[in-house]
Amino acid sequence: MMMMMMTSVVLGPFGNFMIPLMIGSKKVAFPRLEAASFWFTPISYVILLSALWQGGFQSGWTSYAPLSIQQGVGQDAYIFGFGLQGLSMVCASTNIVATIINYRAPGMTWNRLNIMGWSMLSLGFTMILSVPVLIDGLYVLTLDRTCPNFDA
């Protein structure tokens, strides 16, 4: 949970602001994706925090389907907040990867890209590659919550 929250901040508002400055670009590749990733982040934090006041989410550090069969709105808000967080990270990472590849300054070769640029590029590729895992995890959490197979 903590890694997902910190990664979305590093990729989203911070990354979309710092990457054009580091590579000598005037803008990001997709400004609307930047705005979407920026605004999805605080909304998902509010939804995650509101889950605490709506009965709480009692899944612990894991949101595995047998542990997420708790009834109530808290667990649903928790799942929706993490889904929105994942959407924010995918928007930001797509924007960062496209910006680094396409909008570098004319003299900026791959050898001159600093370590923060390389780390953001590798983190962005990793987040894009994790999209099927995110989709599958949300699918399992939302559809298997009401499955009676896990009942004792």
Each predicted region: which residue ranges?
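Membrane-embedded and interfacial regions of multi-pass energy-transducing membrane proteins
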Residues: 1-152
